Regions:
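Juxtamembrane intracellular "pre-TM" segments in multi-pass secondary transporters
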Residues: 6-32, 216-247
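Helix-loop boundary and gating motifs at the non-cytosolic
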Residues: 23-78, 243-269, 276-279
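Central cavity-lining transmembrane alpha-helices of secondary-active solute carriers
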Residues: 72-90, 281-294
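Helix-to-loop junctions at the C-terminal end of transmembrane segments
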Residues: 84-96, 182, 290-308, 394-395
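Structural signature of the two symmetry-related core transmembrane helices
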Residues: 100-114, 310-327, 407
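Symmetry-related core transmembrane helices of the 12-TM Major Facilitator Superfamily/SLC fold
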Residues: 195-214, 401-418
């Protein structure tokens, strides 16, 4: 009788214990939850950042700032925003601690609404630079964490695609905060701008809450293991990563900056000012949709080919689509310009999804923070060099000069893509 009871108790115990399949499903659900939390963080964060970005120039101008001062401030901010990413990536790899940098970086967004509480230009400049430094601190470790979460049966492409889509929703909604304030108050003076900044306080609170929740779930259930294995040795940084960085430089250098497109459409009278901003918003929507589609395609290619680096095949979309942007967006036709900006949105979505996903498939996790830091610096340098060159060429030779420049740069990117694809197989 005792033996029979023991067998029954053991059977009940085994039934009560969750199966390995159930545990795996539970882990995947937690990962999806964290990925969605990070998506909300990106969305809310961009509401704060892009909202302020749409108003900073006008607000500083009302307080007496010069164009030279704004140019130097923005240039310095972008320099810190990209250069320090290499430092933060290196720190998180050396220490194995990603979350302090992520939380501190997003926490720095609190300085943005505080910009509405002062009219001192020196203080405002300091707050602006703190926000840029905060973004540099958080981006490499955040991307590193997301890249490993994506390996939990979700897919790197779709994870970064979802992040970009929600990011663009925030980028679209952010400026609407100030637009709503202006429409409601019927004013565009200093007080109106300060009210707009004040409305960003609760959004910052949502950012912090979402980040802390993500941190709690990841650390409690150990969803990210420091020093976990990543790509295989034959697909590591020493073999392919430098070649990928060369591709990144030329691909980003060949992307026409929207500032040049907007300048052309305005100076040539192709479309009205309101239509320019509307088309830019449409391009951001296209960006969000393209990010999801190309991200999913990236994962599908990897699964079908059965090789970790197979997703790199989708990189061909970047040089192919980038070449068409100047010939459409810098034309004299409103319809062609609209098509060009839609193509511009596709390129941006691919940049933010596939190019970031590829880092995860080319590097081991313990070096991924540094890899993302290097990627961001190279990307920023390429975009800066390309935009500067295209601006000079447009002033001297107009749209044809920019088109020729893009052709050369993206042709180089395509040749590097071919070599990269061969090395990755």
């Amino acid at each position: 009788m005792t033996n029979r009871q023991s067998v029954v108790d053991q059977a009940r115990s085994e039934q009560a214990r969750p199966s390995s399949a159930q545990c795996a499903q539970s882990a995947v659900r937690r990962v999806v939850f964290v990925v969605l939390l990070f998506g909300l963080v990106s969305c809310f964060g961009d509401i704060v950042y892009e909202g302020a970005r749409s108003a900073n120039g006008q607000y500083f101008s009302l307080l007496g700032a010069s164009a030279t001062m704004m140019g130097i401030l923005y240039g310095t901010g972008e320099f810190f925003g990209y250069a320090l990413r290499l430092v933060s990536g290196r720190i998180c790899d050396e220490t194995g601690r990603h979350w302090p940098l992520i939380i501190a970086g997003y926490g720095s967004l609190i300085v943005v609404p505080f910009m509405g509480l002062t009219t001192n230009l020196g203080v405002l400049c300091a707050l602006f630079l703190i926000e840029r430094i905060g973004k540099a601190l958080r981006n490499p470790p955040k991307d590193a964490v997301l890249s490993q979460l994506s390996e939990k049966k979700i897919g790197t492409g779709i994870v970064f695609g979802l992040q970009e889509a929600l990011d663009q929703i925030g980028a679209f909604a952010g400026p609407m905060v100030f637009t709503a304030v202006f429409l409601e108050s019927g004013r565009t003076d200093v007080a109106a701008y300060q009210l707009g900044y004040a409305w960003l306080f609760p959004v910052v609170a949502l950012v912090v809450i979402a980040v802390v929740c993500a941190w709690r779930v990841v650390t409690r259930f150990k969803l990210v293991e420091e020093g976990a294995a990543g790509a295989s040795k034959d697909a590591g940084p020493a073999a392919i990563f430098p070649l990928y960085m060369a591709f990144t430089f030329f691909a980003s250098a060949g992307l026409v900056a929207f500032s040049i497109i907007g300048f052309h459409l305005k100076s040539r009278g192709v479309i009205a000012d309101g239509a320019i901003t509307t088309l830019y918003s449409v391009a951001m929507i296209v960006d969000a949709i393209a990010a999801l589609v190309i991200g999913r395609l990236y994962d599908v290619v990897k699964v079908r080919v059965g090789k970790r680096t197979a997703g790199l095949k989708t990189l061909f979309v970047i040089p192919l689509c980038s070449i068409g942007v100047p010939f459409l967006a810098l034309s004299e036709s409103a319809w062609l310009a609209a098509a060009g900006l839609a193509l511009y949105g596709i390129v941006l979505g691919t940049h933010e999804t596939v190019m970031r996903s590829a880092i995860a498939d080319l590097t081991v996790f313990r070096k991924r923070g540094t890899a993302y830091g290097i990627f961001n610096v190279v990307y920023g340098l390429g975009f800066f060099a390309g935009s500067s060159l295209m601006g000079i060429l447009y002033d001297h030779w107009g749209s044809p000069g920019v088109g020729a420049c893009v052709l050369v740069l993206e042709a180089a990117a395509f040749l590097l893509f071919i070599r990269l694809n061969r090395r990755a197989q």
